[in-house]
Amino acid sequence: MNGVGNGPNGAHVELPDAELSTARLLANTEPGGGVLDPREYQIELFERARARNTIAVLDTGSGKTLVAVLLLKHILQIELNKRANGAKPRVAFFLVDSVTLVFQQSAVLRNNLDQAVAHFFGSLGPDLWDKQTWDKHLEKYMVIVCTAEILNQSLLNGHIGIDQINLLIFDEAHHAKKEHPYARYATNYLIMP
């Protein structure tokens, strides 16, 4: 099913449902200006995610990205306070499954967060970066949107430690099957004995 969204010139364009909620979120915000008023169920989801690991299962267009933005704002405020008290920088990772989603979600986050957001994908060469290059990015940015495999390889190669991450958001978590990087994160880092 498709719907109508605003294109770059403000003209109406047909968008698939998967892009509608993001298009609305982008169209109705100023850069760094904040998000629309969340609905009650989104606030409940945010509160749950704030307290523990959460998988949000909602229909397309129901505002999962808005919940992620609320959670990021909360985590980033905590991070800013810790950094002000001399703590080592930690970064939130928003993981996606495609380069298209890297651009889409990083645009949404830039429009709704006051802190620096980076976006990385394979053709930028992050798999060739050394630890020093990653450390520079972790110092500069508070949120990184990237394809899941980039973070997976960076962790495996020791360029990033799990202790340098304050939040992992899996966009389209239904991909967490078999050998997908999402499944590997859950197995290697999130499942505690």
For the regions a protein language model found, what residue spans apply to each?
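Conserved RecA-like helicase motor-core motifs
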Residues: 93, 106, 113-128
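Conserved motor-coupling elements within RecA-like helicase/translocase cores
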Residues: 126-144
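Conserved catalytic network of the ASCE P-loop NTPase/AAA+ motor domain
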Residues: 79-88, 110-113, 135-139, 158-163, ...
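Pre-Walker A (Motif I) flank of P-loop NTPase domains
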Residues: 51-56, 88-92, 141-142
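Conserved pre-motif I regulatory segment
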Residues: 10-57
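Walker A/P-loop NTP-binding motif
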Residues: 43-54, 62-86, 187-190
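Conserved Walker A/P-loop ATP-binding site and its immediately adjacent core
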Residues: 60, 65-70, 86-111, 149
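SF2 helicase catalytic motif II
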Residues: 141-144, 148-152, 156-193
